[in-house]
Amino acid sequence: MNHLGKTEVFLNRFALRPLNPEELRPWRLEVVLDPPPGREEVYPLLAQVARRAGGVTVRMGDGLASWSPPEVLVLEGTLARMGQTYAYRLYPKGRRPLDPKDPGERSVLSALARRLLQERLRRLEGVWVEGLAVYRREHARGPGWRVLGGAVLDLWVSDSGAFLLEVDPAYRILCEMSLEAWLAQGHPLPKRVRNAYDRRTWELLRLGEEDPKELPLPGGLSLLDYHASKGRLQGREGGRVAWVADPKDPRKPIPHLTGLLVPVLTLEDLHEEEGSLALSLPWEERRRRTREIASWIGRRLGLGTPEAVRAQAYRLSIPKLMGRRAVSKPADALRVGFYRAQETALALLRLDGAQGWPEFLRRALLRAFGASGASLRLHTLHAHPSQGLAFREALRKAKEEGVQAVLVLTPPMAWEDRNRLKALLLREGLPSQILNVPLREEERHRWENALLGLLAKAGLQVVALSGAYPAELAVGFDAGGRESFRFGGAACAVGGDGGHLLWTLPEAQAGERIPQEVVWDLLEETLWAFRRKAGRLPSRVLLLRDGRVPQDEFALALEALAREGIAYDLVSVRKSGGGRVYPVQGRLADGLYVPLEDKTFLLLTVHRDFRGTPRPLKLVHEAGDTPLEALAHQIFHLTRLYPASGFAFPRLPAPLHLADRLVKEVGRLGIRHLKEVDREKLFFV
C-alpha cells in the first residue's frame, strides 16, 4: 500500500438526471468518403463530417452517432483537409443501443453529451458563450473593456447512465472597441486579436504601412474591396492594414484591417487596473459560485437538479530524494553533494564587460563538487559573439579542452538574441545557461537555480529517487513546437533512481498526432539506451503521453513491447480536465490521489495553500495491468526529479516535463543545431 491515509474531497462535479431511453439509443450513420482517406486522416475527417452534418452528432468508430433525427442533418456535402477535398455521404442505419457500463460506448454517449451542451449553450440569450464556456455577469468595467464572470463547463455520462456536469468559475475580459480605436487611446499593440464579425482569433504581428485600397489579394480585389464585398464595412471604418497570422502557422502573415479587428485582452494589458480586478478566488468562494452556476445550468438546460459529487482521496507517501545523501529539494545537493558526479569542465562567457567568475559562484561550485568527490575545472571564454568566426573558433577550442557547458552572464537580452546565442553554442555541442546581471550573492534562489540548470546541461545527475517502483523505465511523449510543424519528443528516466537516459526527436511532422512508426522509433531508442547502461532490457516500461492519446497512436509500440516480453503501462496525462478538488474538512497537500471511473484518476502533485484552489492532473490508464495506486505513486514521485528547479517542483512528472521543454526549445532554436549535442545532456532545461 502506497498511501499514508485517506480523506474525502468535493469535486467540482455534479450528478444530474439519468439519460432517457432515446438518448441511450442514438442514431447510427454510415459514412462514405470520396476519395478514401489515408489511415492517419480517417478519424480527423470523421470528426469534421460530424460537425458539418449538424445537430448533436459525433464520431462513433468508423461512422457517426447522433441524438438528432437524420431528417434534420446535412447528409451529403464536401469538406477539405490538408489541401485535399473530400465528398461525403451519410447513410442512416437506425438506432443503436449503447451501454454506459461499457467504457467505449460510454465515451460515445459522453461525446454526445458534450455536443448537446455546446448546442444548448449557443441558444441561450443574454450571455456570452465561447465553446463550453458561458459568461453571464459583469464583474468590472473600464474605458473600452469589461470583465464578465462565468464558468468553463463540461458534460459527460457516468457508468450509471446519468449526466455529470463539471463547473469551473472563470472570467473573460472583453474589449468593446476596434483595434484602431484601442490604439488611438495610446495602448500598446495587443498580442492577439479577433475578427469583429466572428469569433476567429489571430496573432497580431505588426501594423502595416500599405494602403488598404491598393494592397492586392490573390483573388484580384484589394484588401479593402474584399472586406467590402463581404459586407463587413457596413457601419464600420476599415482603418489601417494590420498583419496577422493563424496561431497554428505564425510564419504565414495575412493582411487585415484594424477597423475589423478587436483586441483580445489579458490582465497584462490591463495592468493598471489589475489590483482592483481581484480575479483570484479563495476556494470557499469558488466552491459557492460553482454550486450556484451548476444550479443555473441544470435549470436552463433541463438537466435536473445538480447534486455535488464527493470522492475518496488518498495521501501518497512522500518521495525520498537523494543527493550524496538524503535531501528535501534539489538545491540541497549543492551543499551535500550530487547523486552522481564525474570530472567536469565548465566555461564562463561574460557579455557584461566584467572579467572572471564571480567569487560566490566559483565558491558554490567548488564546494558542491568537493562534497560530491569529483573534480571541477573552470574556464573563461575570452571572445565575443560579435567576433563571428573568431568566436566560433574559441568555442571549438573550449570543446576540445573538455568543456561540457557554458554559463553566460549578460545584461538582459531580447529573446531573439538569446535564442541566436544559444543556437550558436549548441552548434559547437555546448549547452548554455544564461543568467542576467546584475547578480547579487543574496539572490540565492536565482543563481542556485541557474547553477543546477548548468550542471544538468553538463550531464550530471544532481538528485535521484530512492525506492522501488513498478516500471524500470519511464518515457514521456509530447507533440508540440513552433509554427505548423511539431516534434514528437521523448525524455526518459530510469525508475530505480530517476537518472536521465537520453532525449530523442524525430523529423518534424504536421499536427498534434505522433505517427505510430515515430512512436516506436522514439521508444526503441530509449530501450537501447537502457540496455547500454543496464546490460538488459527493462522488465516494465511506463509510457506517459501529454494530453489525450489519439486512437492507435501507440498500437505499433505496444505490439513491439509485447513481442519483446516487456510489460508496459500507457497513461494519458492531462493538464486540463482534472477540474478542482475541495477539502470536505481540513486542508489538502501534495500527493493526493483520487480514483475515479474507467481507470481514470486525479493526482494533485503540487499544491500551495496561498495559490488558490488545487488543480489536479487528470490521468487515464489507457493500457497495462499495474494497479492505479501504484501508477499514481510512481508518477507523483517522478514530479520531484526536474533537476533545474532547486526549490519548487513542477506539476508534471519529469519525463513529460522534460519532453515538453524539449519540443518547445527545439521549436525556438531549430533542430539543425543539435547534431553535436550529447543525447544525455539536458540542453533544454
Curated annotation (Swiss-Prot):
It is an enzyme of class 3 (hydrolase). Mn(2+) 3 binds at V685. It comes from Thermus thermophilus (strain ATCC BAA-163 / DSM 7039 / HB27). GO terms for molecular function: DNA binding; DNA endonuclease activity; manganese ion binding; RNA binding. Residues 338-463 are annotated as: Mid domain. The keyword Nuclease applies. This is Protein argonaute. Keywords: DNA replication, DNA-binding, Endonuclease, Hydrolase, Magnesium, Metal-binding, Nuclease, Plasmid, RNA-binding.
